[in-house]
Every structure is written in C-alpha cells, then in structure tokens.
Amino acid sequence: MAGLKQNEDYDNYVVNICPNDTEGEVLTIGGLDIQLPKAPKKKEILFYDRKPAMQMWERLPVPAELQRIRSMDEWYEMPSDFKKRFSPYIEKEFDRRRNGVWFYNNGVPVYITGRHYMLLQWSKMDIGYASYLEFQRRLFIHFAACETDPRSIGQMYTKCRRSGYTNMSAAILVDEGTQVKDKLLGIQSKTGKDAQENIFMKKVVPMFKSYPFFFKPIQDGTTNPRMELAFREPSKRITKKNKTSNKGEALNTIINWKNTTNNAYDGEKLHILYLDEAGKWERPTDIREAWRIEKTCLIVGRRIVGKALVGSTVNPMDKGGNQYKEIWRDSDPEDRNANGRTKTGLYRLFVPAYEALEGFFDKHGNPIVEDPEHPIQTIDGDYVDIGAKTYLKNERDALKHDARELNEFIRQFPFTVDEAMRDSIEGSTFNIGKIYEQVEHNQELYPNPVVVGNFQWKDGVKDKEVVFSPNPQGRWRVAWMPPNELRNKYVIKYNKKHPGNDHIGVGGVDSYDLDSTTDNRGSKGACHLYNKFSMAAPPNMFVAEYASRPPLARIFYEDVLMASVFYGYPLLIENNKYGIVRYFESRGYEEYVMKRPEHLKTPGSINTKTRGIPSNSQDVIQAHAHAIEAYIEEHVGVNNETGEMGKMYFDRTLEDWIGYKIDNRTKFDLTISSGLALLAAQRVKKEKKQSNFDDKKFFRRYTKEIRR
C-alpha cells in the first residue's frame, strides 16, 4: 500500500504514492519527499516506439464506436461481442485512472498521476483539452502525496496569475466525485458568484459532461445544474410496475458550492474542499477563521477523512493577504507538532512565475526558463529566443520608474514567496517601492554581508571583554563591527562607565518584561545598533539587528547589554517596560541607557531622571515614524541623486517596515527599535550661553577622567 516509508537516504518519512506499493524515484517537492511508482518495462510506456524528438504528450485516440454511446444503459443494450471487443479498452482506462500513466517525453520516461491523466485525456474545457505542463505534473504529484499522507489535510499552493490551478482543482473534484460513495465535495471562492459561475458552472459541470459514459455515474437533476452536481438515483413515481428503487446503484455523492462565509460548511462532513483564491477573501470573511472551522469538516477524531485544495495569488495585506500569509507560515512540512502535522494540517507549495508562465513551454511541456542558445518552438507553435526569466525581468525593468506598477507586476508574477506576499504600495506608511528595491538588491548579494551569531563575555568573565561568536542559530545579525581598537571602549566619569563610542553610533531597544514562560503572546525583544554620520565608521547605516524572545527576559537584557558594551554605543530604550533599564542599573551600566533626547521633550515639561523614552506620546510616535520615513527616502533602495544602492542589509526589518501601521504599532517590534535608534541619532546638544568670568576668582578645580 502507498503511504509513509522509511528510507535510509532520507532523514524524514518518504511519502510513497504508488497504489501498488512499488518503489521508484524520489522527488522533493515543497519540502516533501515523494516516491513515485517504479517505471514499467519500456514497451509498457506510451510512445516508446517514437523518436525522442517526437515523444510528447498527446491525447490517446478514443474508439469511434464508443464515442457514440451516451450512457451505461446503451452499453448494456449492445451485443455481447461488441462489449467483449471494447471491454479491455474500458478496463485499461480505469487502470490508468487508478494507477497513473507512464509516457516517454523527449527520451525520458515520465509518470503522471491518475488525476492528471483524467485532466489531460477526459476533461474538456471551454478552450479544449489541457496541455501537458511539467509544473502541473509536480502539482498533481504533490497533491497525491497530500492525499496519501495520513498526517496531511491537503495542499496549499501560492501561485502566479493564470497557472491553471482552478482547472486542476475542478478536474480533481470531478474525478473523485464520480468514484466515491456517500461523499460531499465542496467549493468556495472569494465570492459566492465566483464559486458558482467561474468554477462550478464553467469548469466542474463541463468537465463532467465531457466524461465518457463508462466514467459517468447516475445523475439526478438537470444536465446543466447551477447549485449542485448530484450523483444519486432520480426520483421515480411509485406504480404497480415500479414499487422498488435501484438507489443502491447510485453513488449518492454531491459536488456543490457555497457562499463565502467563515462557517459555510460548518457541521458537514467533507471529502474534498476546494478553497479558491484563499488569499483574496476580504472582510467580513476571514480565511484563517474559515479554515479553523472548515478543517474540522475534514477530520473525525484523530482521523483525517477528507482533503483540501487551497490555492491563490495573494491580495494586499489589508485585503485578505495577511490572513493568508499566516496560514502559509503555519503550513511548512518541515515544522511539525508532536503528532506529525503542521499547525494548519496543510502542506504548502510555491512555483516561481518563470516556471509557470504561459507562452514559455516547449513542445514537450517543459518550461523555457533561461535564454536558449537557439530559438525554441513552444507548445503553441511559436518560437522564442529568450527565457521566461529574462522576459519577466524585461517587464520589470520597463516599470522601474513606476514603483506602484512595478510592485503590482512583481506581486502577480513572483520569483519568490516573499515577492508573492508583497503588500500593495497604496496606503502604506513608508515608501514600499524603495524598500523592495533594497530587498531585491540584498537577495543578489554574494557573499551575504550579514553574519548571524551571539555576543558573549570572553572566557565567561563578565564585565571584562565582550566578543562576537558566529552561530547559525544565533540571536544577533551583524553587518559591520568596529575595528579592534574601538571594541569594548568605555570612559570612566564620576566613577561610572560611559560608552566610549557615542560619537560614532547609538542603539534603539523595544523591550519586554515578562518571561515567555508566563507570557505567550509572542512579542519579541528587538534592538538595532546604528552608525551616525561620522568619519570613524560607515555612516547612516544599521549595523546590528536583534529580534528574539529567549525564555527568560534577563537573557534578552544581557544580550542587549553585551552588544552595547562591544560597540560602545548608548541605547535609547522604550521605557514603558522598565525592566531592562533596572537591569542595566543593577549591573552598573546605567550610563549606557540614554535619557529622553532634549528635542523630543514636551515643551514646559519637568526634567526627570527617568531614562528611556515613552512610546505612548503622540509627539514621539509621529517623530518616530518621520525618522524612519526620512531614512528610507535617503538611505534605502536606489538614491535618486547618486544612483547608489542603500546599505540596509536587514531583511527582517525591511519586511517589518512594509507592514507597519502607525495606528497599530504593537506587533512591529523591529520597526519600534529601529525608529528609536534613528531618534537617538538625532540627538541635538544645545549650545550653552557663554558667560564672562574675567572679573571673578575661583578655586582651582580638578576633574578626573579616565579613558579605556
């Protein structure tokens, strides 16, 4: 039987999808290791007798005699020799439907699942029959693994525009719905109208009508249903000659659609659920809440009894995209709970746009990604001399001076998941166009200028010397470190340590007070270190980033303290949570915590000894946002005056800036700390009025200052 298998070459379970339990090649798709059936003998593979260049998918011929038969009733009325002649053909089609098909494609034996075969061979659409495309083969294989894996509730596919996922999902619904008994298969989309007209009436019903008679179960209702496709015995009037019903022959299975509400199928037991355009469900519907409710329709106790197809391009974050993004985050097959499931139960999958772009498939259905040496004939009969990647890059280059249009194009045809999850520029607090310019630049940098690691006391001796230790699992990300002579530099004034490099840089901290063992809300401690304008170090640059939540708050405090000591930078700390300030004071480092800068004090306010800065002041909130806004305009992305690229290398912070909402700041820890660092860098020292003491006499006074 197909299912989970142990394989010595793989650390995790391999999902074997062969109905006959043979073991063939293993593909890794979307982080899932999937084992295909073992390839059969050469002569059992379609198109084996053709030259490699002529080996490609083609629909198999259907006997003309069978095409004239419309129902099983007509079949039963045919002569026995007729049925004997064509029964092997019908049995072979059922075998292909169950076990899948092997065919030669340009000299390579290729396996397609039974559901994929049903799409290609038997599912006619308004544009005719589907072409074989390699990326869709992988989608079908991935879904077969989701169906086979007892830990999975289904597939989540983040896609580019026009990738054919609706056709694929409709084909799966019809294929499964015409085989199983007493089941319900459901459809929802971003609106009820979309579910009814664009999927059910334009896809599902025509595909079913195109099936040959031997795949069509008994159907109740009209030939063009609008609400449901019901495979049950039609109602009959009871007469003297008809006192019984043959309902046992019917499947009693239904494919239907429902309006877009969070609980549309609540209380139902679903066999397959297709959630179309799940990244575009807008309020009052919420795809997170809908999935929380409706996945229970696919589970009975601990058993998963149904599967889901969830696919979409992604709307702007405030129009359903953020909720979809959260489901995506929790659907990583490499992040499972103790029961072996992802948090959502789904397995996510992404295909870059350049592997799924219309017009860029050769006649064998393989994507033309890179530029070919010679023009290549496409599956449409045209010739192309560039690859899909170059084509899309050319389109991007043409829009580089229109940030809004460029951003929308990238969102619709993404190369990466991050691009697919991009937010719309409209209504954003900051210039997202420039932020994305920086993100794209950072992705192309090699080697990566950011090093991950931890700061620690040398040899474990506190308050002596801090060193940095690279560690892939570290909590700090560092893009620049001071030269040896500037590290751990401090000044003793009035018997207290003061940071020795405050003329070079500063830091900002968004803290928390409660240990994670008592506070599970997920807010992280965040810190940024920033170089001001100076000749001693790269200016106007964030040099270190921290975003973590150790189990104990004091671990976070010590992490920040050590970094501050190492760089010799003072910190501006949000003082609504005062625990970190007390910690610095208890360790003798209170002078490493800045007081509220003079230019951010409320006019007429009384001076206070409290260190840090409140985050609930509207003046501070506005100044904080303006500081980040100005920094992005001047130092992020391409500088419009010089043409130079910014040196902001921390992608987590860039992504945090993208989503930042000034009226809902709570969850944007990195935005808070980075803005505080920029406010600290703005600190202005007021010049004191000089007095004339020529006629005054004073005792001589000595000051003691020791520099280390």
Residue ranges and their predicted role:
Residues 2-12, 16-23, 27-31, 232-254, ...:
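RNase H-like, metal-dependent nuclease domains and their acidic two-metal-ion catalytic environment used
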Residues 150-173:
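Walker A/P-loop
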Residues 172, 198-207, 269, 289-294, ...:
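Alpha-helical scaffold elements adjacent to nucleotide-binding pockets in ATP/GTP-utilizing enzyme cores
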Residues 176-183:
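Post-Walker A helix-loop "phosphate-sensing" segment adjacent to the P-loop in P-loop NTPases
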Residues 184-261, 309, 440, 444-452:
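Conserved nucleotide-state-sensing and coupling region of NTP-binding domains
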Residues 285-303:
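Short, conserved "post-DEAD/DEAH" coupling segment immediately C-terminal to helicase motif II
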Residues 593-638:
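Short alpha-helix plus adjacent loop in nuclease-associated cores
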